[in-house]
Design a protein with these regions (language model features):
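Toprim catalytic domain recognition across nucleic-acid enzymes
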Residues: 1-371
Length: 371
């Protein structure tokens, strides 16, 4: 620092990064190293050559509002933690601590636990019928009615009734009575913010939040000779730079064809009004770098997370999927059954990002003709 006229402060693009930059200037001031020197704050969401050069060419002053926000946040952490933790440690068996975030979260858990305690359970049974058409396609159905009696969730309220229905249904012959169809478009998901990444990595990969952030940090810092593989992973934004979107659209058109590319770039709203400005979504730093190209240089978990981020990023700018939402009403002499599901007409973004949603995913139905 003594031999430099200009000092670039390239900390993380968030409140904490701004506070660290401010502290560095203050330390230099205390050590009388500030005279005749210019301190310039730069930030870049990813370790990409164009981002770094752009940041150096467009430095700014330290944002005192962000510094104050970080100081306030730290004060609240310490105010709650230092004041309340000694009390909770004395009054609980396991020496629990308290905090600005964990205490409200604990209150929510306690309220939910109270709801569980006062809940009165009520027995009910599901009877799911699996039918097979003449082409060996399987269709899962539920009971709508038996004669004039309509079924609801609690109609079958004991095992005896369930088994009696099972035996009665086995004796019936079923045919398609009617069907309803409507076309449904499903839009792609936005690129990842940190919270969305944690949710998806948990549901689709079985990763804990701690593991996801740890692996994402490795991908951001760079693996071996690959350099940084993803952008800043603690971002609360789900937006991409326009230049990256244009690059992404060109790759999609080349790799998948024009039918998978919308006429205009897909735009997304921020999920919160408190999103820090300047952040980018969590995306690959080099969009051309396919997961398969670098699989041998990553460990298993690194590959899985990079693959998830890459697919989500590409899917975000692809065409909607199109399906026919279909309901079949299947009848016998005594029963009316219903089968709901979808018939895919165009995969769209699902060609890349087609993870099963399990309970939320409708069954894929075969085409059936009446009777």
């Amino acid at each position: 620092i003594k031999d430099s006229d200009e000092i670039y402060l390239a900390l993380d693009p968030d409140r904490e990064g701004e506070l660290i930059a401010w502290h560095l200037v203050e330390i230099c001031r205390e050590k009388k190293l500030i005279d005749g020197k210019k301190f310039k704050r730069i930030e870049f969401p990813a370790v990409r050559k164009e981002d770094i050069l752009s940041a150096i060419n467009n430095p700014r002053e330290i944002n005192q509002n962000l510094v104050n926000a970080a100081i306030t946040r730290r004060f609240l952490d310490r105010f709650f933690g230092y004041k309340i933790s000694p009390i909770t440690k004395r009054r609980t068996i396991f020496g629990s601590s308290a905090g600005r975030v964990q205490s409200p979260a604990l209150k929510i858990l306690c309220e939910k636990e109270k709801e569980i305690d006062v809940f009165v359970s009520k027995e009910f049974w599901d009877v799911n019928i699996e039918l097979t058409d003449n082409r060996k396609h399987k269709i899962e159905c539920t009971i709508v009615s038996q004669g004039q009696k309509k079924f609801d969730k609690f109609t079958i309220n004991n095992e005896k009734k369930a088994k009696a229905l099972q035996e009665a249904i086995k004796k019936e012959n079923f045919s398609l009575n009617s069907l309803n169809k409507r076309e449904k478009k499903r839009n792609p998901y936005s690129p990842f913010s940190n919270s969305l990444l944690l949710q998806d990595a948990s549901s689709k990969l079985g990763f804990s939040p701690k593991l996801t952030n740890s692996i994402a940090q490795e991908l951001k810092d760079g693996v071996g000779s690959l350099g940084a593989l993803i952008t800043y992973h603690r971002s609360d934004s789900n937006k991409m730079k326009s230049s990256e979107i244009e690059k992404l659209r060109k790759i999609i058109n080349s790799e998948f064809g024009s039918s998978f590319l919308p006429d205009k770039p897909v735009s997304y709203k921020e999920r919160s009004k408190f999103v820090q400005q300047g952040h980018e979504a969590v995306t690959p730093t080099e969009l051309e770098r396919k997961p398969s190209d670098i699989k041998t240089e990553l460990n298993e978990n690194q590959y899985k997370l990079y693959d998830l981020i890459w697919k989500r990023t590409f899917a975000s700018q692809m065409s909607p999927s199109v399906s026919l939402e279909t309901t079949y009403y299947i009848k016998s002499e005594n029963f009316l059954l219903k089968a709901s599901g979808s018939i895919e007409k165009f995969s769209g973004f699902k060609k890349v990002y087609n993870y099963s949603e399990k309970d939320n995913e409708a069954q894929t139905l075969p085409e059936l003709q009446s009777n």
